[in-house]
Regions:
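A structural signal for short beta-strand/turn segments enriched in small hydrophobics and glycine
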Residues: 365, 406, 446-458
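Zn2+-dependent peptidoglycan hydrolase active-site motif and core
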Residues: 395-445, 467-469
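Primarily a LysM-type cell-wall glycan-binding module
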Residues: 41-43, 48-50, 54, 83-122, ...
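Catalytic glycan-binding domains that act on GlcNAc-containing polysaccharides
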Residues: 155-314
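Acidic, glycine-rich catalytic/binding loops that coordinate metals and/or anionic ligands
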Residues: 346, 351-353, 394, 401, ...
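Short alpha-helical segments in extracytoplasmic peptidoglycan/chitin-binding modules
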Residues: 104, 109-127, 139, 207, ...
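Non-catalytic cell-wall polysaccharide-engagement segments
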Residues: 29, 245-366, 504-528
Length: 528
């Protein structure tokens, strides 16, 4: 039996793990028909995906208006030519045999940098003050011992703002682009949550819910199956347009969600310092260059789940690479990034945020920090359950209330999003995301709310919930934020602190401590 067929059969066996329903509570799912896939299962499963190649791309027209932006100058993603994959290790710019001279990037923390470079935080020095906690100023110069040696592929691929649903998407209209492109996607539709949904609606929904840049998702779909600018070359691309080929997980919506999860894993794994290498389907492992940005690592990680190393190299660094197509479709990503980055400005701090229920009410802190949205996202969400009795999983008569003033920019699929800067864009500034808000009496989009205004009722609607509650998370400029990270989550003066595992944690205020407990015990009750 050929090696490729062995890889394929092993992949199918591992992929069956996705058919086992998750027992985790309070976890957002993609739809009622889709089982949630754990991060561990996703990592294990996708290492065994069969080898795949993109179809021949349809050249993007050279039009100068929507949907095609004129290609700009080459970005820093330009890579060495005529080099075999893995044959030319390169020391990152600014490094020597003994030390790296590293310029801090937006979103960097001392702890994450130390993990990426494989050193202890105290081994990193700078002529400027280095805080143990909090965000480092972008551009601060650090001297770091070189313990990783030479690394492969240090060149940046995409800026962070082109990977997440960031301010760079404010002037991008997904629907206009898709309909202007006149490819297969324009006529495609499928059932999602029991409702017929167009391909354009699917792309936009995945982008908004997972906070992944729609340009990236569209370019990926075109690169893998030619859906956006042309027609699929093979019938298999209809059922599995990205080629993940997970049994029972067919269709555009499910495949795009898998891709979004993988992008999320790479992006936030690098951001936190927990991801330092990638492993290909054939078992080859490479150390990631520690000077890369989160967006570039997200792309490297995603494509390592789709290709063995030679194919991965061609897809990211070859003459007809994914990045070449991305630029043909949307213009220079680095030029756009220059207009919106850094995503984390100097001195950024969370605005005043209140607990999501009315003053005087008693609720249970039923879930400590856990995944903000999906596998790979930071532990940015916390849960609150009304202490009003009633059936375990029902729509409560209690109200979820606005934790800060702002504009409701999204109210659908049991999610309410408040835009705190009021500009009407979820991808800019501070936003608060509430999940499991019942359909009944849920506030519509487009309404301005003040602190304590009612948003809707907590419920079990959407997700694998085992009890009535509201799930609450934050984003800034489209990036999910860790609840116990460099931008602390503080509600009504209570500081969120994570525990050892998902859903474990505390609320701290002075000498008081509330312990998260899904069962709603006395130690989890909090009164606002």
């Amino acid at each position: 039996m050929s090696t490729a067929r062995i890889h394929h059969r092993v992949g199918i066996i591992l992929l069956l793990a996705w058919l086992i329903p998750s027992i985790a509570c309070n976890f957002p799912t993609r739809s009622r028909q889709i089982r949630e896939i754990s991060e561990a299962s996703l990592r294990q499963t996708l290492t065994a995906l069969p080898n795949a190649s993109p179809v021949e791309e349809t050249p993007a027209p050279d039009a100068t208006e929507t949907p095609f932006s004129p290609a700009a100058t080459e970005s820093p993603a330009t890579t060495p030519e005529n080099s075999a994959p893995g044959s030319q290790p390169t020391s990152p710019p600014g490094s020597s045999s003994l030390f790296f001279i590293y310029s801090a990037q937006p979103g960097d923390t001392l702890a994450a940098i130390a993990d990426r470079f494989g050193v202890a935080p105290e081994q990193i020095t700078s002529s400027d003050y280095l805080p143990d906690a909090g965000l480092l100023p972008a551009g601060q110069i650090l001297t770091i011992p070189n313990v990783v040696g030479e690394t492969l592929y240090p060149g940046a691929l995409l800026p962070d703002s082109e990977v997440i649903y960031s301010p760079s998407t404010v002037d991008f209209h997904t629907y206009d682009y898709i309909y202007g492109a006149s490819g297969f996607l324009i006529s495609f539709g499928e059932l999602v949550d029991g409702e017929w949904t167009s391909g354009a609606d699917i792309l936009q929904r995945v982008a908004v819910e997972t906070s992944i840049n729609p340009r990236l998702l569209l370019a990926l779909l075109e690169y893998r199956s030619r859906w956006v600018l042309g027609q699929p070359a093979d019938p298999s691309y209809i059922s599995y347009p990205l080629g993940f080929n997970v049994p029972g997980e067919r269709g555009l919506y499910k495949e795009m969600y898998i891709a979004a999860k993988l992008i999320t894993m790479g992006y936030y794994g690098w951001r936190s310092g927990t991801l330092t290498d990638i492993t290909f389907p054939d078992g080859i492992k490479i150390r990631l260059s520690p000077e890369l940005n989160a967006g570039s690592v997200a792309l490297q990680y995603l494509f390592s789940r789709l290709y063995p190393q030679p194919g991965w190299y061609d897809a990211l660094y070859g003459n007809n690479s994914f990045l070449t197509l991305h630029t043909q479709m949307f213009g220079d990503p680095w030029g756009r990034a220059a207009g919106v980055e850094p995503l984390f400005p100097l001195g950024l701090a969370q605005p005043a945020i209140e607990l999501p229920f009315l003053p005087g009410e008693s609720w249970s802190y039923s879930g400590g920090p856990h995944l903000a949205w999906t596998s790979g996202s930071p532990r940015g969400a916390i849960d609150f359950s009304p202490a009003t009795g009633g059936p375990t999983c029902s729509v409560s008569q209690a109200w979820v209330t606005a934790s800060a003033p702002g504009l409701v920019v999204r109210s659908s699929n049991n999610v309410v999003v408040i835009d705190l800067d009021g500009d009407g864009f979820e991808q800019t500034g501070w936003t608060l995301v509430y999940l499991h808000v019942a359909d009944y009496e849920r506030i519509p989009a487009g309404v301005w709310v003040n602190t304590d205004d009612p948003l809707g009722h907590p419920s079990c609607e959407r997700g694998n919930s085992t009890g009535t509650h509201v799930h609450m998370a934050r984003k800034y400029n489209g990036e999910w934020l860790d609840a116990d990270g460099p931008l602390p989550f503080v509600l009504s003066g209570w500081l969120v602190q994570k525990g050892a595992r998902n859903y474990e944690g505390y609320l701290i205020q002075g000498n008081e401590r509330i312990t998260a407990n899904p069962g709603g015990s006395r130690i989890s009750i909090i009164v606002r």
